[in-house]
Amino acid sequence: MLNIWCWNDEFQSRFNDYYPEVKEIAADKSTTTLKDGTTVKWTINANENNNYQNKLDEALLKQDSAAADDKIDIFLVEADYALKYVDSDYTLDVKNDVGLTDDDLKDQYQYTKDIVSVDGVQKGTSWQATPGLFAYRRSIAKDVLGTDDPAEVQSALSDWDKFNTVAEEAAAKGYKMLSGYDDAFRVFSNNVSEPWVDGTTVKVDPNIMKWVDQTKEYTDKGYNNKSSLWDSQWAADQGPTGKVFGFFYSTWGINFT
């Protein structure tokens, strides 16, 4: 028995579709049987309200006492909270403990390695990489900038000073530059110069304060719609009647627009 925990069926579906050792998939997709007789059991708990992490944490705390067929063998994590598990005894060195080789890992992106490494030890690996991007509404870009051409829009938004200038121009025409408070957060937080925690000291990187300053300015001047990531207003702003210039996404986010 191989137990794999996920928060949706993305990894499960790719495993079932492309792993050459798959022999049979249960009608309800709860298990996958491999050609060597191994049964892969899938446990899927949705992300909402921290549900996935809560249930995963509870199960991991019971690992030592769990029956062999109930122990978690593989679990998926997101970059936002990967280090919580990487920096724990619940994860293994993928080379020395699991047996992956340098050749197995040679094509990984460095940033996907870094997020699952601690003290030089890699304790996970990624099956996907989703770079960040800024998706904009072409009709609004054309109204504000006079063009919807991606190269020209990119040039107009190529640094924060330019981005802020366009936000002012968009507001003058009745648009919001961003939907909410945390839309730009990852652009700043993913470019910090040092970790949040140093020993027992919490450090707030200057780049985080730049995000705070920008968010306050956008809120005070009406450049955002005062939404929060994933809430109903944020979702509506992406709809056909939305008045928001654009959204910071990863590549998978495009599918939800």
Annotate each PLM feature.
Residues 1-83, 102:
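Conserved N-terminal structural module of periplasmic/extracytoplasmic solute-binding proteins
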Residues 2, 36-40, 68-73, 121-122, ...:
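Loop/turn elements at helix/coil->beta-strand transitions in domains of secreted/extracellular proteins
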Residues 7-8, 77-81, 130, 181-184, ...:
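Beta->alpha turn/N-cap motifs
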Residues 12, 16, 20-21, 213-257:
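Extracytoplasmic/periplasmic substrate-binding proteins
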Residues 14-17, 85-90, 146, 190:
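Short, solvent-exposed loop/turn and secondary-structure capping segments
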Residues 95-106, 113-184, 196-229:
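Helix-loop-helix "hinge/cap" segment bordering the ligand-binding cleft or interdomain interface
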